[in-house]
From Swiss-Prot:
Keyword vocabulary terms for this entry: Amino-acid biosynthesis, Aromatic amino acid biosynthesis, Cytoplasm, Transferase
Primary enzyme class: transferase
Molecular function GO labels: 3-phosphoshikimate 1-carboxyvinyltransferase activity
Residues that hold 3-phosphoshikimate according to the record: K19, S20, R24, S164, Q166, D312, K339
Protein's recorded name: 3-phosphoshikimate 1-carboxyvinyltransferase
Gene3D superfamilies registered for this protein in UniProt: Enolpyruvate transferase domain
Pathway(s) served: Metabolic intermediate biosynthesis; chorismate biosynthesis; chorismate from D-erythrose 4-phosphate and phosphoenolpyruvate: step 6/7
Length: 428
């Protein structure tokens, strides 16, 4: 796909629904008793994989674009799947679903695409095994396909080695089905959509700074869910409007969960012209409108407990940093190596091809700005949606057009991404 420079971006967008919240609303609706209605669901490939898996376990789910109805019959009515549960490209689907399957008294097999086959699963399967689930797979349960025989679980006090919402959620969802109280403690607080949404579905949890406890045996009750726009998708347009001259863009109803707004903190630190209007809706997940204009940016240091709040935004932050005065340092982000691709390597190699001055490090990268991006190269998403979108925005400011291979990867989380660039470019 050939993409070239854009003179300016103007107008407003409704960003598609948050991927994390869309996954959980379907899963928790499937576990609950009654009819769960979901508005502004993200119909991207990952979330559709979640729907397909729960349909294979006998759950009735109607999906019409971004409106979804889940008719749950309670956890005990989930049926043994006759076929493989295929999660596609979705790490969230597989890791959270393992927590649910761990407590179900049946056998299931879970696998996904080539990228999922390379992603580490032992960090999830080990605590679930300690609770009593029988899980096996390649390399002793490290890689898919995984075979799960669930059943009676005992509560656990689990110290997670990394701040990961997926690990935390898998253990909490198993804990919901276990005998006793399960506690998960993390080195830093990771995103808390699971805790907020379990509360919405009637489950009580105890939380402090870095740990969460859940009592086994609680029933979920159906809920009505409004899914705010995904801040990880919004980040690409926040960056685009900051970088493309003469731009002003408004993004409507974007999720502002504080465990996810690291990108906003970084943009402010870099000097972006950004206004936030939070809406007081009483929604479990806060959201609001973001207005951003072209800005002169300066370098930032990104590390420590900021990393879990913006791990998925690092590719687009790296692009921003190429246009910021000074050297931006990103560290403590080794988790990037086990994303859809090794994002430390793919971000550095693809941005270098178009003229960026960037050095990969063991746990992050150093980006020297401000550097004009020459473009005029063949680049690739490597099948990673966030790399594809980073390159789509990079093209807008490159001197020469670039040719993006595997652009369809963006459909994992943002099927209308390229159309939305065109929409804002037309208004300009």
């Amino acid at each position: 796909m050939k993409r070239g420079k854009i003179s300016s971006l103007k107008g407003e967008l409704h960003i598609p629904g948050d991927k994390s919240i869309s996954h959980r609303s379907v899963m928790f609706g499937a576990m609950a008793e009654g009819k769960t209605v979901i508005k502004n669901f993200l119909p991207g490939a990952d979330c559709l994989s979640t729907i397909a898996c729960f349909r294979k376990m006998g759950v009735e789910i109607e999906q019409n674009g971004s409106d979804v109805t889940v008719r749950g019959k309670g956890l005990d009515q989930l049926a043994e799947p006759a076929e493989l549960l295929d999660v596609g490209n979705s790490g969230t689907t597989i890791r959270l679903m393992l927590g649910i399957l761990a407590g179900r008294p049946f056998h299931s097999t879970v696998a996904g695409d080539e990228s999922i086959a390379k992603r580490p699963m032992k960090r999830v399967t080990e605590p679930l095994r300690k609770m009593g689930a029988k899980i096996d797979g390649r390399a002793g349960g490290e890689y898919t396909p995984l075979s799960v025989r669930g059943g009676h679980l005992k509560a656990i006090d689990f110290q997670s080695p990394v701040a990961s919402a997926q690990i935390k959620s898998a253990v909490l969802l198993a804990g919901l089905q276990a005998e006793g109280t399960t506690t998960v403690t993390e080195p830093h607080k990771s995103r808390d959509h699971t805790e907020r949404m379990l509360s919405m579905f009637g489950v009580s949890l105890r939380e402090d700074e870095t740990s969460v406890s859940i009592e086994g045996g609680q029933q979920l009750k159906a809920a009505e869910v409004f899914v705010p726009g995904d801040i990880s998708s919004a980040a690409f347009f926040l960056a685009a409007a900051s970088l493309v001259p003469g731009s002003e863009v408004v993004l409507r109803n974007v999720g502002l969960n504080p465990t996810r707004t690291g990108i906003i903190d970084v943009l402010k630190e870099m000097g972006a012209d950004l206004e936030i209007e939070e809406k007081d809706t009483g929604n479990t997940e806060p959201y609001g409108d973001l207005r951003i204009k072209t800005s002169s940016l300066k370098a930032a240091e990104i590390s420590g407990d900021l990393i879990p709040r913006l791990i998925d935004e690092i590719p687009i932050i790296a692009l921003l940093a190429t246009q910021a005065e000074g050297t931006t340092v990103i560290k403590d982000a080794a988790e990037l190596k086990v994303k859809e691709t090794n994002r430390i390597d793919t971000v550095a190699s693809e941005l270098k091809k178009i003229g960026a001055n960037i050095e990969p490090t063991e746990d992050g990268m150093k980006i020297h700005g401000k550097t004009p991006l020459t473009g005029g190269a063949k680049v690739s998403s490597h099948g990673d949606h966030r790399i594809g979108m980073m390159l789509g925005i990079a093209a807008c400011i490159c001197e020469q057009p670039i040719d993006i291979l595997q652009p369809e990867a963006v459909s994992v989380s943002y099927p209308s991404f390229f159309e939305h660039i065109e929409k804002l470019a037309e208004k300009a």
